Regions:
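Mid-chain, well-packed structural core segment of small domains
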Residues: 52-89
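Non-catalytic interface/targeting segments
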Residues: 1-42, 53-54, 80-117
Length: 117
């Protein structure tokens, strides 16, 4: 399984458009391939397009990492792995437990847009 993870240069997990790096964890080869995110500071949809083009099977997400558009782009094409972890290292340390919790869909609050109150 190839699992996409979006993070910054300090390897802290970030929403799609804030991620400087797209990591692809290849759990069979036990490696993380890193790609510079060409859609950094653009949009979540642009980053999702890159992830889909790379050929990921799943993506690690936290609340508001996705938006309705990027979720719809990936729905049926990726599995979703929700996490409370904050860094690539933590994801790697808990990869087996995270993989076992992969789902085909997300609750709306995970991908809903954040609106200031």
């Amino acid at each position: 399984m190839k699992i996409a993870v979006t993070y910054n240069k300090e390897q802290q997990l970030r929403p799609l458009e804030e991620a400087e790096i797209i990591g692809i964890i290849d759990d069979e080869k036990k490696v993380v391939e890193q790609y510079e995110n060409p859609a950094y500071n653009m949009s979540k949809e642009a980053t999702m397009s890159v992830i889909l083009d790379i050929g990921a099977d799943a993506i690690v997400v936290k609340n508001q990492f996705l938006c309705p558009g990027s979720y719809m782009m990936s729905y049926g094409r990726l599995k979703y792995i929700q996490t409370q972890y904050n860094s690539l290292q933590e994801v790697l340390e808990h990869l087996n437990e995270l993989k076992s919790a992969a789902t085909e869909e997300l609750n709306e609050e995970v991908y809903a847009e954040a609106y200031p109150e």
